[in-house]
Amino acid sequence: MNLYEHQSSYNPNMPVRGLIYFAELYSGYIQKNKLDVYSTKQINLPVPRYIIFYNGTKNEPEKKELRLSECFKYSAQQSDELEQKEMKPCLELTATMLNINIGNNEELMKK
């Protein structure tokens, strides 16, 4: 399941938006294909891919990974627990941002 988006301004919240978009897309996919998420048999879902084409004025690298986990903030209690043991979020989403401004990703732009 591919999700492509064009951005003319840098937005670090793209992974949050991607989470919302993918939740809606997967919900529709599950309904359309009459998949039973309550079954004891595992369902198969298409592999997600989230690409952002960036052409804003802020200087950005040719390729940048934006992660949903970068948006998570721990409470004071969790911060103490984090020091005691490594605490990883149970949810992750990665968006690949490709800079398509002139002089960037030239091979991609030739296609």
Where in this protein do the model-derived segments appear?
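Conserved single-residue anchors adjacent to enzymatic active/cofactor-binding motifs
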Residues: 1-111
